Amino acid sequence: MVFMARAATTSDAFNAVAEPRRREILNYLALEERPVAEIVDALEMEQPSVSKHLRVLKDVGLVHARRDGRQMFYRTNAAGIRPLYEWAATFERFWRHQLIRVKERAEEKSGR
């Protein structure tokens, strides 16, 4: 069986958040809606770069945008982020199991 490498694309949320600066932007937007200028200042990025990343995040449904006069405001889209959360949550059982094993081994070594 021959496997073809998947082309690098930003057509889905997983590929979009593979870029570290986009994750920074999402983290910054996590609690409230913010204007582009504030994102630029807070993350110390160039405005064209922020706008490009926001466009990608919007295209895959991770953020919503709204215009107020001349300013664009962005906020996270919970429905768009949900698939990322659900995927990451599948590992919760793994880590819980690992922590239980560590606890059991520590208790065995301490004679409990």
Question: Where in the sequence are the language-model features?
Answer:
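Beta-hairpin "wing" of winged helix-turn-helix
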Residues: 58-69, 73-75
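Amphipathic alpha-helical dimerization/coiled-coil segments
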Residues: 1-9, 27, 31, 82-112
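Short, hydrophobic-biased segments on the C-terminal half of alpha helices
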Residues: 54-55
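N-terminal helix-turn-helix DNA-binding core of bacterial DNA-binding proteins
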Residues: 5-48, 71-86
